[in-house]
Amino acid sequence: MSDKRRAIEGCLIGTAVGDALGLAGEGLSRRRQARLFPDLSRPHFLGRQGMVSDDTEHTCLVAQALIASAGELEALTRALAWRLRFWLLGGPAGIGWATLRATVKLWLGVPPDRSGVWSAGNGPAMRSALLGVCY
């Protein structure tokens, strides 16, 4: 297995595991999180199984779009926008307001390069790690 493939797999697995471990404490103060979840070595959301958020789902969509586009920027943009549109149809739980607005704009025909919205959220940063590994 190549080093790049190992790095890509590690990024995807690390994103999912970190997301599953941290999801139950999202939005909680450090003190409240420590009181509710003293053992951070396992997932707490949905029992022992854990659950990932839209951050992991979108990282997987980025991976799919990278593969479909062979890394060509315009094709990547179209492939990711297409995937986001159909992801929204699944009725994702806990979707952020900015993600919802941007994806609805895609459905309304706004081009991907103009569908973004201003937000203080960290979603794009969470989903961009794979791009750093690939490029």
Name each model feature, range by range.
Residues 1-135:
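Structured, active/binding-site neighborhoods that engage oxygen-rich ligands
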